[in-house]
Amino acid sequence: MAASAHDYAFQTIDGAALPLTAFKDKVVLVVNTASACGLTPQYDGLEKLYSDYKDRGLVVLGIPCNQFAGQEPGTDAEIKAFCETRFNVDFPLTSKAEVKGEGAHPFYKWAQGQLGEPAVPVWNFHKILIGRHGEAIQAFGPRTEPRAPEITAAIEAAL
């Protein structure tokens, strides 16, 4: 198993390689997302959080996922258009990925190894905070709003 989150890579929503080493010395909030979920309005809070903290070193990384009630059925191009037009999302998005089970992206398997069961997404908009050195800091459940005090306090401490 890899030593840090920086040992993993995703693919951007546009199909380019996205090694997490690109975020060395940044704090990263990794969030599995969906466009047709009751929690989809969290995109707004995620974008505000990103806007508030990006100059201090925070990256929000959206991971579209269709594993929860099929609530992210679109293509990567459709997801990107939805996020940009409905929520003015400016933070990076990856191509669709699985976040739990045998087919889970290796990053999520690593996070579970680091943080235990709290790192396993139970629904859309589950959040995992990664520190500047690639360490797994904390996981937050889907109903925890992006700008909730427990998330902003953890981000402040990590920055």
Annotate each language-model stretch with its function:
Residues 77-124:
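Short, internal strand/loop/helix patches
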Residues 23, 34-46, 65-68, 72-73, ...:
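Short, thiol/selenol-centered motifs that function as redox-active sites or metal-ligating centers
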Residues 1-21, 41:
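N-terminal "domain-start" segment that seeds a small globular fold
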Residues 106-159:
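Thiol-/selenol-based redox modules, centered on thioredoxin-like
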Residues 26-27, 36, 40-63, 84-87:
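Conserved helix-turn-beta segment immediately C-terminal to the redox Cys motif
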Residues 57-74, 90-101:
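Thiol-based oxidoreductase modules, predominantly thioredoxin-like and allied folds used
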